[in-house]
Amino acid sequence: MATAMTVSSKLLGLLMQQLRGTRQLYFNVSLRSLSSSAQEASKRIPEEVSDHNYESIQVTSAQKHVLHVQLNRPEKRNAMNRAFWRELVECFQKISKDSDCRAVVVSGAGKMFTSGIDLMDMASDILQPPGDDVARIAWYLRDLISRYQKTFTVIEKCPKPVIAAIHGGCIGGGVDLISACDIRYCTQDAFFQVKEVDVGLAADVGTLQRLPKVIGNRSLVNELTFTARKMMADEALDSGLVSRVFPDKDVMLNAAFALAADISSKSPVAVQGSKINLIYSRDHSVDESLDYMATWNMSMLQTQDIIKSVQAAMEKKDSKSITFSKL
């Protein structure tokens, strides 16, 4: 026991010496529990973010280090119009570079998450492309589809964890969107529908590529895709599409913001590095992923966040008391 205490003292001394040789540690004196922090955050009036001004979505600062991206066309059931496909890309490109943001919650305003693509607004682009030459029309449509695909790929490429909070219907493009998110919560009344076959086309902006890897049950994915049937909340939970189901939207959003607060209290170097490596590992072999991880961590292991975390643990302080620098 005495030997262990001596080793711990020496390790603590070494950590303190290294910290003094770089920069001073600053601790957040607040030791509030996650639940109390989440309750306070849920009561806080959201503040609009000045550099996020959009027609189809609304971005607010839900709490410290957490942004709330809300699909904001409730009168149109949050249908995805022309502006949406452009604005969501711009939004997440900004979030990716926002050093103050550490987690994002995505939800829908009104009675449902989204009804999918706004066919009334997008019909001319898709059904009446410009030109009369088959090859040139094909090039136009390929470019159009590629731009739509980028709308959701930008979520996946954003290093900050993205939590989808789904209520009511999540139809068509909505499934493409949530498949690109990192964590999915839903309400008991939520349903999910790969709707594209009902309008005569194959889903082309991410569902067919990501959903099999999210659920891990190709037979079920094929069934949902070929029939456009609704998957209800309980089945979504059983299949792994969502990780938790809540009785209503308010309870779900409070839980999503609490989760985001918990994530944002961790080292952003560790969290964002974990997301990047999880996605890389999904698409590569174990050996390739291990090699990528080794290359990644040969620089990331030099972060002061490790020293701060170890010191807090040895001093038996709440990890939420640590102040991590922006990333």
UniProtKB/Swiss-Prot annotation:
Record's keyword terms, sorted: Acetylation, Fatty acid metabolism, Isomerase, Lipid metabolism, Mitochondrion, Peroxisome, Phosphoprotein, Transit peptide
Site location (Important for catalytic activity): E196, D204
Tissue: Expressed in heart and liver (at protein level).
Cell compartments where the protein resides: Mitochondrion; Peroxisome
Transit peptide (first-last residue): 1-33
Modified residues (N6-acetyllysine): K326
Gene Ontology BP term (one): fatty acid beta-oxidation
List of residues that carry N6-succinyllysine: K230, K316
Effect noted on mutating E196 to D/Q: Strongly decreases dienoyl-CoA and trienoyl-CoA isomerase activity
Principal cellular location given in the protein's record: mitochondrion
Binding-site list for substrate: S115, G116, I117, D118, L119, G173
PANTHER family for the chain: DELTA(3,5)-DELTA(2,4)-DIENOYL-COA ISOMERASE, MITOCHONDRIAL, ENOYL-COA HYDRATASE
Role noted for this protein: Isomerization of 3-trans,5-cis-dienoyl-CoA to 2-trans,4-trans-dienoyl-CoA.
Protein name: Delta(3,5)-Delta(2,4)-dienoyl-CoA isomerase, mitochondrial
Organism: Rattus norvegicus
Gene behind this protein: Ech1
